[in-house]
Each structure stands twice: as structure tokens, then as C-alpha cells.
Amino acid sequence: MPLEAQKVGVYACGPTVYDYAHIGNFRFNVWVDVMRRVLEWTGHEVKLVMNITDVDDKTIAGATRLKQSLGDYTARYTEAFFDDLCRLRIAPAEHYPRATEHIDEMVKLVERLKARDLAYEEDGSIYFRVERFPDYGKLSRLDPRHLRSTGRIEGDAYDKENIRDFALWKGAKEGEPSWDTRIGLGRPGWHLECSAMSMKYLGETFDIHVGGVDLMFPHHENEIAQSVGATGNPLAQFWLHCDHLIVNGTKMSKSLGNQYTLKQLLDEGHDPVAIRYLLASVHYRKQLNFTYEGLGQANAAVARLRELVLRLEKCTEGLALEGPGEGKAALQRADQGFRETIADDLNTSGALGHMFSLVKATNAALDCGNLASGEATAILAWFHDVDRIWALLPREQQLVERTIEINGAVLEAVGIPISDDNFELVTARMQARADRDFVAADKLRDRLVKRGISLEDTAKGVRWHVDVSGRSG
């Protein structure tokens, strides 16, 4: 139960804007978006806060390397992140607090910790005393007596009383940005940022805290220690962690050349909505194995759904008023199964399975003439209703049924929405065929096939379809 009836406060650990986000990052963002949409679909009002880490070791190193100000350096990647969220149809959070804009809140939190003797100063930096917080390690089920400094903590390389202690405030260093505050000249530690900003926008205790599974330790343990240490109250009622995305069964990394950005995939001609579908199709607590074959299958799945919705929209008036009831029964089964599975720890894969069972049953009923007009209307309304969660269906302005004039003839180009550059290839091929330049037309067709788009020439023009094969080669 939420702390306040029908209202849910959610804090999500957002990007560190030192580089362009990759599809592993967006697996998390799509999951958060689906979770938020499910909560809203079930009648809750959601307040989502996602931080932007725009000051840390990586952002400082990047800005220094390019001889840019920290603000200029991080602004480029922050803007790109928001652009990618839009392309993936991710609804915006209510707040995107930037770390550099909340220094005062962080200073106040450190002062509260010092007042409780949970923080100490050493050589200009301020650290949290882990040994004075007995619940440290409970979230990740680790014994604090056996913990070692790892990852981003070890990289801080600052002096401290105990190897397990972590930096709250880092003393100023030459060439690094710093703030002159009541607790000294320096900059915030990574963990401090999230504690201060989550409590500012959601209160000392809120409903749900989410992040990647790699953040459970040490980041979320440190957040809990700071926040609970300062307030004496739980930070969040529930902690949810999204598992990793891997590529072709292998960990994603720049060194292996398999760390894909959204822009890379879009430049290859892939539909961002199909990418969204793929990222949402596996339960969040399981690894998602990204492959181009899987992306092709996601393209095909989205196409099947969109084509059925378009079919239902066009055929409703021509259907019989009554039928054998196949459509009604299929809808009831799908709706019940969908609701049960999506409510079971956000089981997206199971819920999608129920949705596509209805796609299959509806197409079969239409093919046999066994779907009544009332059933078709109800099924169409159901698909639009659950799409409040998935955001897969074409928006009103994105329905692609265009007429093109070539050599004085008006031709039609009709199909599932595709990217503008792919549509330009479709148009160029239509022009080549009209000019009887069949060699050029065949080459353009081959380019589209490699992008997972097949063409069907008709007397009126051309139709396109998304293939299961996705990317070839």
C-alpha cells in the first residue's frame, strides 16, 4: 500500500551524463516507464523523480579532457538523453533534479549527519562512519564486517578512518569544480546526491526506489545509510532493481564493440517503438539478451499488433451484428490473464503473451467471419486501453497512408509507420520504377530488405511490411 492512498512516489537513479546513454541504460528507463504506466493504469497518481548526475569523477574527467566547462560538457549528453527518452515514448518524470543545482540540500544533509556523529572530516573531505550504522548491508544481504571498498568508492582515493567508509563531501582539488559551502570547499560525493534530491522532492520516506541491479551495492546501501542515519526513518518502502542487458550472450562493453546507442540502431533503420517493445519484453529481474534476431522479432510483433488494430478500425462497419461469441470469449480470457500477470511483480513477458493470444484469436475470427461488430469494437477498445502501458500503437498523426505524385500519376504508399529515412528510400524506389530504372529500384529494395522492410508492389502503389529477419549480415 502506498503511504498516501492512490498516490505513489517513485525515485529512479538516473544517468550520469558523461557519455551518450546505451541500450542497457534504456532497458532500465523503459522498465521504469512501464511500471509508472501500470500504476497509472490501475488508478494511481504517480510522482516520478529521476536525478541527473552532472558532477562526479567521470563527468569531470571528460570535461577536463575536452577542455570544456563541466556545464557545457554535461549539457550535450543531458539533451541527448532527453531526446532518446522521447524517441522511445518514455513519459517524462515530474522532476529531473540535477546534482549541481542541489548543493545546498546536500550540505544540509551532511550537517545533520555530523550532528549525529555519523560523519567526520579528514584532509578537507567528509566521510560516513559505516561502523556506526548497524543496518549497513541489509538491502544487499552483505555482512559489513567483511566488506571491502570497491568500484566508484575505491576510485575516490581519499584518506579515511576505515576502508568501508565512503565520501559524503570531497575536498577541493586543483582543476576540479568545487563549491564554497558551510562544510568546506569541495564537491558532493555520488551517493550523497541521490539522498538529498530524493528527500527534497518525495519526503524523508517515500514509496518506491528503483535502480539497476549493479546499484544495490554500494550505491543504494550508502543512500540508506545517509538518509536513515540523518532522519531515523526508512528511506523507501520498496526497493526494485532491474537486471542487466547483455548482447549476444556477452556483457556489453565498448572494448567489445557491442555497446549500442539508440542513435546507432535508429541510423540502421530500426523502429524505436520496436526497440521499446524488445526492452520491455523480458521480466525486469531477468537478464535481457539483445540480438538483432530478437530485434527483428520485436519489429514483427509490433507490426502484427498495429496491422490488426488497423484491420479492426477499417472492418467494423462491415461485420455482422451477432456472431458465435468467439471474440467475446477470447477477450475475456486475455483481459483476465493480462491483469493477473501484470499485477504479479510486473510480469511484462506474461502480459504480452496474453495480449498476443488475443491478436491471434482475433485475426482467426476475422478470417473465418466469426467476429461480430460489437466484439470487434470491444477488442479494439481493449488494445487501445492496454496500450496506455505499452505505447506501441501509432499515434494519430503517425498513421502512414500517403499519396505521392510521380510523373503525373497519384500513387499510394501505405504501411506500418517507419522512420523518415526509410520512407525516403520507399519513395525513391517508387520514382525509380516510374522511370523504368529497374536496376536502381532493385538496389533500393535490397537496402530496405537489409533494414528489415519488405515491399509489395500493387496497381495503386506500394505497401511495406516489417520482416522478422531484422538486420541481415
Kindly label every feature range from the protein language model.
Residues M1-R89, W464:
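N-terminal, positively charged nucleic-acid-binding surface of large information/translation enzymes
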Residues M1-Y18, N29-V34, D83, D104-K314:
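Alpha-helical recognition segments enriched in aromatics with Gly/Pro capping
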Residues E45-K47, D117-D123, S454-E456:
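Short, well-structured beta-strand/strand-turn elements
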Residues I52-D57, T78-F81, A91-M106, G124-F133:
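Short, glycine/charge-rich beta-strand/loop segments that flank catalytic centers
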Residues A61-R65, Y136-G137, E223-I224, R471:
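Short low-complexity, flexible loop/linker segments enriched in glycine and/or proline
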